From Swiss-Prot:
Keywords associated with the record: Kinase, Nucleotide-binding, Serine/threonine-protein kinase, Transferase
Record-linked InterPro entries: Kinase-pyrophosphorylase, PPDK_reg
Record NCBIfam families: PRK05339.1 (NF003742)
Residues at which ADP binds: 156-163
Protein known as: Putative pyruvate, phosphate dikinase regulatory protein
Pfam families: Kinase-PPPase
Family (UniProt): Belongs to the pyruvate, phosphate/water dikinase regulatory protein family. PDRP subfamily.
Upper taxonomic lineage: Bacteria, Bacillati, Chloroflexota, Chloroflexia, Chloroflexales
Enzyme superclass (EC): transferase
Catalytic activity: N(tele)-phospho-L-histidyl/L-threonyl-[pyruvate, phosphate dikinase] + ADP = N(tele)-phospho-L-histidyl/O-phospho-L-threonyl-[pyruvate, phosphate dikinase] + AMP + H(+); N(tele)-phospho-L-histidyl/O-phospho-L-threonyl-[pyruvate, phosphate dikinase] + phosphate + H(+) = N(tele)-phospho-L-histidyl/L-threonyl-[pyruvate, phosphate dikinase] + diphosphate
Length: 279
């Protein structure tokens, strides 16, 4: 197989915002930088303030098989976008809804729902961008020589949700690396030099792992082969992962049927108690 990048034009990614769309664009560009040779048109739709604009952008995305990434603060607009996207079969990524919901619960206050209110402190703003950039660059075991720079290292077998959980934590300001656990592939030596209190082993029960893997195969339209989608093999693999985590003294978190927000909250609580200097 050639190591040369292959140019691949993909359907567009719509950045929908009630403001300028800068945050959504930044996250999109940082993430796309990890896909060498991929050409994904970014279409920024700023200043979205009414339902007719929502309907228009969803329709455009549906016709082009596009994906919508949105940072809408107004709840009614966000709900309408998600509703229409479901109806039209359009993939959508909500960058702020989960964070708003969590903070509303913690603070016991309702968000204002107005775009453009945030004027970031320069240092905090760039620290968060650094966290996102680090996390994107250290996805799926990349750059193991820099694992020592991570606030959190997630380890787990295929389909436990390492990448989306890593990105959610990064948006909250945490530098996160994730490392795949594969029987045929030795874990990087650098992982064992990381403070084990920073390493979190993720577990998803075998039935859900199998369902996720089968869904992925159907979506990709390919058969990976072997025992990848075997339930018996998944049981064995999950138990092996548990033993591996215990062997190295890594905290194990079972994320079966948990939302990303719940899993992130559990991890943040653990890490914050262990390292009070972290965000």
């Amino acid at each position: 197989m050639s190591d040369q990048p292959v140019s691949q034009t993909a359907p567009p990614l719509y950045i929908v915002s009630g403001g300028a769309g800068a945050v959504g664009e930044q996250v999109a560009r940082l993430t796309l930088s990890q896909f060498e040779g991929a050409e994904v048109p970014l279409i920024i739709i700023p200043n979205v303030r009414d339902l007719s604009q929502i309907a228009e952008v969803v329709e455009r995305a549906a016709h082009q098989n596009g994906t919508i990434l949105h940072t809408l603060m107004e709840p009614s607009l966000r709900r309408e976008l998600m509703r229409l996207a479901r109806e039209r079969g359009v993939a959508e990524i909500d960058l702020v809804g989960s964070v708003l919901s969590r903070l509303a619960t913690v603070l016991r206050k309702e968000p204002l729902g107005k775009p453009g209110l945030y004027q970031p402190r320069r240092s905090a703003y760039f620290e968060r961008l650094d966290a996102i950039e680090y996390t994107v660059a250290h996805d799926d075991g990349n750059k193991p020589h820099e694992l020592h720079q991570a606030d959190i290292v997630l380890v787990g077998i295929s389909r436990v949700g390492k990448t989306p959980l890593s990105m959610y934590l990064a948006v909250l300001g945490w530098k996160v690396a994730n490392v795949p656990l594969v029987r045929e592939v030795p874990l990087p030596a650098e992982l064992f030099q990381v403070d084990p209190r920073r390493v979190i082993g993720l577990i998803v029960e075998a039935e859900q792992i199998t369902a996720r893997r089968r869904w992925r195969q159907r979506r990709m339209g390919v058969s990976i082969g072997g025992n990848y989608t075997s339930l018996d093999a998944a049981y064995d693999e999950v138990e092996w992962a548990r033993r591996t985590f215990r062997q190295h003294g890594w905290t194990t978190i079972n994320v079966t049927d948990k939302s990303i927000e719940e899993s992130a909250d559990e991890i943040i609580t653990l890490i914050s108690r262990r390292f009070s200097q972290l965000p």
